[in-house]
Regions:
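NAD(P)H-binding glycine-rich loop region in Rossmannoid oxidoreductase-like domains
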Residues: 29, 41-99, 103-106
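N-terminal Rossmann NAD(P)H-binding glycine-rich loop of SDR-like oxidoreductase domains
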Residues: 2-26
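Conserved catalytic-site region of short-chain dehydrogenase/reductase
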Residues: 81, 121-128, 181-184
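Conserved catalytic-site loops of classical short-chain dehydrogenases/reductases
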Residues: 70-73, 113-119, 174
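Conserved Rossmann-fold NAD(P)-dependent oxidoreductase catalytic core, especially the SDR/UDP-sugar
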Residues: 26-28, 87, 98-148
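N-terminal Rossmann-fold cofactor-binding loop
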Residues: 30-35
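A conserved pocket-lining segment of Rossmann-fold NAD(P)-dependent short-chain dehydrogenase/reductase
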Residues: 191-209
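Conserved beta-loop-beta element that borders a ligand/cofactor-binding pocket
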Residues: 157-184
Length: 209
């Protein structure tokens, strides 16, 4: 299969890229700094590197890079620095998701293209009316005011929910909401749930990349 990954130079994106290549898939990555990828990945015969900031690509370039891909994965996130949290682009994840989905629609491929968005348990699924305590609602309301990356994550998922929806004839999407991400030396077991089973604020779990 053919995959396109944005955010491939990040901690999660690197591992996703490595695992897809190890399984024999063909992978394209859009990265600003290819040197951040492990040498074994950079030199892999099945890897195509597009050196660019994803939002700097033209619509035509974006459509060309998406063309022929069975799936697109966004592992984008904001650096945990003052500039990364409060500088531009503030809507990195949302704008990348929107433009990648528009590129898929532009190509009008015969089959469905899968879109995987790495999101966060701090974002609730409004389609499922997930419950939150009054304290949690107050804290998340405050986060929306002071943390632009939190708003970006919410709006990216909302774009998929509201603009792409469940019945799009070209895109099948999922927003993956891991708990606090950690690094383990080996691949560990994991479980999937439609909604968080613990509070993302109080007593949240850990997810190994």
């Amino acid at each position: 299969m053919n995959y396109l990954i944005v955010g491939a130079s990040g901690a999660t994106g690197r591992l996703l890229t490595e695992q897809l290549l190890e399984r024999g898939h063909f992978v394209k990555v859009i990265v600003r700094s290819p040197e951040k990828l492990p040498e074994s990945v950079r030199n892999h015969e099945n890897l195509t590197i597009i050196r660019a900031a994803v939002l700097d690509l033209s619509d035509a370039e974006m459509a060309q890079h998406v063309k022929g891909c069975d799936a697109v994965a966004s592992c984008l996130g904001h650096n945990v620095t003052f500039k990364g949290m409060y500088g531009h682009p503030r809507k990195l994840v949302t704008d990348a998701t929107r433009r990648l989905c528009q590129a898929i629609h532009t190509n009008k491929s015969d089959g469905m293209t899968k879109y995987v968005l790495m999101n966060t348990t701090a974002n609730s699924n409004r389609d499922l009316n997930e419950s939150r305590t009054l304290t949690e609602k107050a804290v998340f309301g405050l986060l929306r005011l002071v943390l632009p990356p939190h708003v970006d994550n919410e709006k990216a998922a909302d774009y998929l929910r509201l603009e792409i929806g469940q019945n799009d004839n070209l895109i099948e999407w999922v927003a993956v909401r891991p708990d606090g991400l950690v690094d383990e030396d080996t691949v560990t077991e994991y479980e999937l749930y439609p909604s968080p089973i613990v509070s993302s604020l109080f007593g949240s779990g850990k997810t190994s990349r």
